[in-house]
A protein has these predicted regions:
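Short, glycine/charged-enriched secondary-structure capping and boundary segments
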Residues: 30-33, 108-112, 136-137
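C-terminal anion-handling pockets and recognition modules
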Residues: 11-15, 134-193
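Extended, low-complexity cationic-aromatic segments
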Residues: 1-83, 182, 186-192
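RNase H-like DDE/DDD metal-dependent nuclease/strand-transfer catalytic core used by mobile genetic elements
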Residues: 26, 75-123
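Alpha-helix C-cap/termination motif
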Residues: 7-10, 88, 114-115, 167
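RNase H-like two-metal-ion nuclease catalytic core shared by retroviral integrases
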Residues: 98-99, 106, 122-144, 155-157
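RNase H-like polynucleotidyl transferase catalytic core
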Residues: 39-46, 113-136, 150
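A structural preference for long, well-packed, hydrophobic secondary-structure segments
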Residues: 1-2, 6-7, 79-91, 121-128, ...
Length: 193
């Protein structure tokens, strides 16, 4: 981590933590309070459609890039998202990602090689979502948008999630607050190195 941070500062790069999230039409379950003997109920039709989002957040500024996707995540859709981010930025991008198959596929290796002039990829250790600050953003969006709600119409779910995502895209300071604990831990690692 200290070397990645130094490299990002030296290149004046965006240091982006990436991940994907899925938002279910039937809502997200959570703990809640209710009077004894009166458990809360959320209506559902059994529809199992989900709304998926690719996301990247910048370690330094909280800038948030995202793209919705209605199909399954795959190398092609991930490459399209990264191309969108490359087209929106001028800086070098250092992307820290998990080991999802479509992140590490042969097609993505070719993509990364093709764009190595502006794109550096770093892998998170296996099974370590706790090292990825964007997880806090997904948790917050799920709590604000679909939690304990059922959306009879898929466009209603999309609108609710998009509203929450747009809010965070317009207020990067809120993202830096969400990331603060992780960034503080990462900063301590840098100072100790």
């Amino acid at each position: 981590w200290p070397q990645i941070l130094r490299q990002a500062r030296r290149k004046k790069a965006l240091l982006l933590f990436g991940d994907e999230a899925s938002f279910a039409q039937w809502g997200s379950l959570s703990y809640t309070w209710a009077p004894k003997g009166q458990p809360p109920e959320v209506s559902t039709s059994g529809k199992r459609k989900g709304y998926t989002i690719f996301g990247l957040i910048d370690y330094f500024t909280g800038q948030f890039f995202y793209k919705s996707h209605t199909g399954r995540f795959n190398s092609e859709s991930y490459a399209a998202f990264l191309l969108d981010v490359l087209s929106q930025t001028q800086q070098h991008l250092i992307v820290i990602q998990d080991g999802a198959r479509y992140h590490t596929s042969k097609a993505m290796q070719v993509f990364f090689e093709t764009h190595k002039g502006r794109l550096t990829i770093e892998q998170l250790p296996a099974y370590s979502p706790d090292f990825n600050p964007i997880e806090h953003l997904w948790k917050k969006v799920k709590k604000e948008a679909p939690q304990l709600k059922y959306f009879p119409d898929f466009p209603d779910l999309q609108a609710e999630v998009n509203r929450a995502l747009l809010h965070f895209a317009q207020t990067p300071s809120e993202i830096t607050v969400l990331m603060a604990r992780d960034c503080e831990k990462l900063g301590r690692v840098v100072k100790a190195a």
